[in-house]
Design a protein with these regions (language model features):
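C-terminal active-site rim and adjoining tail of enzyme catalytic domains
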Residues: 98-99, 105-202
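Metal-dependent phosphodiesterase/phospholipase catalytic core, i.e.
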Residues: 1-102, 115-127, 136-146, 159-161
């Protein structure tokens, strides 16, 4: 891990904070404008490892309500079942449909028979492999593609369908510059310092 992120400053003894702790920290520091992006990490390929995507999504939403979180919130997931549940029950919350066509989490499963278990019943091949069209069919408005596979044509297609594009996870300045030139709406990054510096220079 340290080799992958050599610039990261270690913090011995620190653990990943619970969502409630994050909300409390933002309240204590009067950071109501900071957006909370919460990824729902469930897998249809390992159904016994977590609660159902619907249960996890509902637990997150209820915690936000019980803590009276005033920060803008977005939920994102590779498991579109969590997002379609929220579309039905919490339609006012921005939902980002994550996608990737390779690696450990190939949630699109293009060219394979039937619907991908990740896509809430959608068979991506029914839409000619178009992720924006598949998201639109579910009522979604935000797409989070893996940045290396994103093309300008896909960005234009998504925008034509009223879908904003938020590629992940972009840490290299040249990649950031290329994606900004494509016209993406947001960039998900581990290095906001680099992205902000680039935006200021443009």
């Amino acid at each position: 891990y340290a080799r992958r992120y050599p610039d990261q400053q270690p913090a011995d003894g620190q653990r990943i904070p619970a969502l409630r702790e994050v909300i409390t920290l933002l309240k204590d520091r009067n950071k109501e404008a900071v957006e909370l992006w919460r990824e729902i990490k469930t897998s249809p390929e390992k159904p016994g490892s977590t609660s159902s995507p619907q249960e996890v999504a509902e637990a997150v939403v209820q915690l936000l309500k019980s803590e009276a979180a005033t920060n803008p919130v977005r939920l994102l997931s590779f498991d579109w079942r969590a997002l379609t549940y929220c579309l039905d029950t919490h339609s006012d919350m921005p939902l980002i449909f994550l996608s990737t066509a390779g690696g450990k989490t190939n949630n699109l499963q293009q060219g394979q028979p039937g619907a991908s278990p990740w896509l809430a019943g959608v068979d991506i091949d029914d839409y000619g492999g178009s992720v924006p069209r598949a998201i639109q069919s579910l009522g979604g408005r935000f797409w989070g593609p893996y940045f290396k596979s994103l093309t300008s044509d896909q960005v234009q297609e998504a925008h034509g369908l009223g879908i904003q594009v938020f590629p992940w996870t972009v840490d290299d300045i040249d990649d950031m510059r290329r994606l900004i030139d494509m016209g993406v709406d947001c960039i998900i990054t581990n290095r906001p310092d680099r992205l902000l510096a680039l935006i200021k220079r443009r």
